[in-house]
Amino acid sequence: MSPDREAVGVLIVDDQAPFRRAAKMVMAATPGFEVIGEAETGERAVELFEELAPGLVLMDINLGPGINGIEATRRITAAHPDATVLLLSTYQAADLPSGADTCGAAGYVNKEEFGPAVVLDLWKKRHDGASSSS
């Protein structure tokens, strides 16, 4: 990453500590991104989004008690339409729960396929086209 560009702050949301650790390792290996926060619940994800203003949210669909990742994404993107939220789960894309395609998420990735290349590809698709005028 060039010194003149700030890292994109990442919020990791998952109720399973082992996956949060794995996601932190993936993001550490992804140039241009830095984990700035973690949440175990959908409610805490919404709160932390407001506090930290991350550039990217990695959101598990199935969270413990309270609101799930789809509802948390809906709340974040309703208040911040430019937010970039990537839904993560063990579901196959064809088996995603109702609302996953309309909650405002930038995309969906199966946890088994999650890695630096996937994050970079999503980021480029979402942001390079929107910021190409200079």
Positions of the model-derived regions?
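Acidic, metal-coordinating helix/loop segments flanking the phosphotransfer/catalytic sites
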Residues: E38-L56
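Conserved acidic segment of CheY-like receiver
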Residues: A7-P18, A23-M27
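Short amphipathic alpha-helix used as the core "switch/output" element in two-component signaling
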Residues: E47, I67-P81
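The short loop immediately C-terminal to the conserved phospho-acceptor aspartate in CheY-like receiver
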Residues: G55, N62-G64
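As written
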Residues: A100-G107
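Active-site residues of response regulator receiver
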Residues: D14, D60-I61, S89
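Non-catalytic signal-transmission and effector/linker regions of two-component phosphorelay proteins
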Residues: M1-G9, A117-S134
